[in-house]
């Protein structure tokens, strides 16, 4: 039996679930059920397949977030491929194919390509379709999974099936772009069309050979990029300059629409790409009034709403069909039928050089996290959590001084030539232009308040004097 390696596509910045989804914390890292994130669920649902460790492909800027989420489910194993620049799905999958052939000695593994931000409600049907597709993939076919449509949907591409090549498997007649409503309705009524899920199964060599034949520029650039892989803790770093030369293209355009070896396997597993707040409402558990409620919420005489609150109490009276999402720094109120226009809010924030589209007030770092409590002219207050054993790299700031007050735990601090320890209710002052580090030597998290003061308080006022991951000494 061929080794099966999941390839999880975790790139993208996702704006359709703003304000929960941000550039630095996109939807694949969100939890839609209050427990695991979409990325974690994507990996966990593969457990019955007894597959190899997943290869996760992500943006360089999301690397520590991915690493922490994999660590939390015991799936971190030097298996995160970093894209130095975005080049769409065809090159990303090629990187995974090349890496898998390097990692699996004397084998040509099957690659199960999945998006990190999809929801599957019927996992048994999902796994059955994968097991069925393995037969065709081992024969050199490039299998795509077509979702049996439940309605006329204009937001998805479609796959038209051709001749049957076995039970519940067909050749691909054509891939079609997102249709208008009447065309989509015709597709659904014909029972010959499936939603294009963006999920695939094929041998690593089969994909690379088709890519080489159909898109040789992509193949060559990716081969060059993995020619000098630089392992970096849990990350696989490819050659940035070589990959920057790669054309940007999707797997559909570069390969699947042109190959003679495409096979579509239908799947009816309660799939959703969670592409909007309304689709999230569709798949979520509802109360008797068909409201989806997350947080401290009282909905009176209100129906068909999606209401989410991080911390504040929200009450509604006599409202229907709304999406209300409140985070620490933003509030979205929209008719459920208009949520596709949330992109206009993101565009507005970008045009006005605001931060609410980019990051949350709580920001994750390799050593832990911080949240902005308050800010004003020439000062900024943060609450910082440092993981056990983690530390800041040696650094200094040109334009700001810092006061550190320990709330709980113990901090081992290097300030200039001094090395000392402070504990709960103790503090220290770090002047500007002073080299300093901080480590949590304990087995419990370190909590501290940081008060910054100075003429320039942006995150880029930092001079790092050592390269440091934040995980180890």
Swiss-Prot record:
**KW Nucleotide-binding (keyword) present:** yes
SUPFAM superfamilies named in the record: Nucleotide-diphospho-sugar transferases, RmlC-like cupins
**InterPro entries reported for this sequence:** GMPP_N, Man1P_GuaTrfase/Man6P_Isoase, Man6P_isomerase-2_C, ManC/GMP-like_b-helix, Mannose-6P_isomerase_type2, NTP_transferase_dom, Nucleotide-diphossugar_trans, RmlC-like_jellyroll
**Pfam families referenced in this protein's UniProt entry, alphabetically:** ManC_GMP_beta-helix, MannoseP_isomer, NTP_transferase
Task: Give TM regions.
Answer: none
Pathway note: Nucleotide-sugar biosynthesis; GDP-alpha-D-mannose biosynthesis; GDP-alpha-D-mannose from alpha-D-mannose 1-phosphate (GTP route): step 1/1; Bacterial outer membrane biogenesis; LPS O-antigen biosynthesis
The entry's keywords: GTP-binding, Lipopolysaccharide biosynthesis, Nucleotide-binding, Nucleotidyltransferase, Transferase
Q: Which GO terms describe its biological process?
A: GDP-mannose biosynthetic process; O antigen biosynthetic process
Which transformation does this protein catalyse, written as a reaction?
alpha-D-mannose 1-phosphate + GTP + H(+) = GDP-alpha-D-mannose + diphosphate
Q: Is Transferase tagged as a keyword?
A: yes
Q: Which family does it belong to?
A: Belongs to the mannose-6-phosphate isomerase type 2 family.
What's the subunit arrangement here? Homodimer.
- Protein task: Involved in GDP-mannose biosynthesis which serves as the activated sugar nucleotide precursor for mannose residues in cell surface polysaccharides. This enzyme participates in synthesis of the LPS group C2 O antigen.
Instruction: List the protein's name.
Output: Mannose-1-phosphate guanylyltransferase
Gene name, Swiss-Prot/TrEMBL: rfbM
């Amino acid at each position: 039996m061929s080794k099966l390696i999941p390839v999880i596509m975790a790139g993208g910045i996702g704006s359709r679930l703003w304000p929960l989804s941000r550039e630095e914390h996109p939807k694949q890292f969100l939890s839609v059920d209050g427990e695991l994130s979409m990325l974690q669920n994507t990996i966990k649902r593969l457990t019955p397949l007894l597959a190899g460790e997943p290869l996760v492909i992500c943006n360089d800027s999301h690397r520590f977030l991915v690493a922490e989420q994999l660590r939390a489910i015991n799936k971190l194993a030097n298996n995160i491929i970093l894209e130095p620049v975005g080049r769409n799905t065809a090159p990303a999958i090629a990187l995974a194919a090349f890496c898998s052939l390097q990692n699996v000695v004397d084998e040509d593994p099957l690659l199960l390509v999945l998006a990190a931000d999809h929801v599957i409600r019927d996992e048994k049907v999902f796994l059955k379709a994968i097991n069925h597709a393995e037969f065709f993939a081992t024969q050199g076919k490039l299998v795509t999974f077509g979702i049996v449509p439940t309605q006329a949907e204009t937001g998805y591409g479609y796959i038209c099936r051709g001749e049957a090549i076995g039970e519940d498997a067909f050749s691909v007649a054509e891939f079609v772009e997102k249709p208008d409503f009447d065309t989509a309705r015709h597709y659904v009524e014909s029972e010959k069309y499936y939603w294009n899920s963006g999920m695939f199964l094929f041998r690593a060599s089969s994909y690379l050979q088709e890519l080489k034949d159909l898109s040789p520029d992509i193949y060559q650039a990716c081969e060059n990029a993995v020619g000098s892989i630089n392992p970096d803790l849990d990350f696989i770093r490819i050659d940035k300059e070589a990959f920057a030369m790669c054309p940007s293209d999707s797997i559909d355009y570069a390969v699947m629409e042109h190959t003679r070896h495409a096979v579509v396997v239908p799947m009816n597993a309660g799939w959703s790409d969670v592409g909007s707040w309304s689709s999230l409402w569709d798949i979520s558990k509802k109360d008797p009034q068909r409201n989806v409620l997350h947080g401290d919420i009282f909905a009176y005489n209100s129906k068909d709403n999606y209401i989410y609150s991080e911390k504040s109490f929200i009450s509604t009276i006599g409202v229907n069909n709304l999406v209300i999402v409140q985070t620490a720094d933003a509030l979205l109120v929209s008719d459920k039928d208009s949520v596709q226009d949330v992109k206009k809010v993101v565009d507005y924030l970008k045009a006005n050089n605001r931060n609410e589209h980019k990051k949350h007030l709580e920001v994750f770092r390799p050593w832990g996290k911080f949240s902005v409590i308050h800010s004003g002219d020439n000062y900024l207050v943060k609450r910082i959590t440092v993981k056990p054993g983690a530390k800041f790299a040696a650094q200094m700031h040109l334009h700001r001084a810092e006061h550190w007050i320990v709330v709980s735990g113990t901090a081992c601090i290097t300030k200039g030539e001094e090395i000392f320890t402070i504990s709960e209710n103790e503090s220290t002052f770090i002047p500007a232009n002073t080299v300093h580090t901080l480590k949590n030597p304990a087995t419990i998290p370190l909590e501290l308040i940081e008060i910054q003061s100075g003429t320039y308080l942006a995150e880029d006022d930092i001079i790092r004097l050592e390269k440091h991951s934040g995980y180890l000494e």
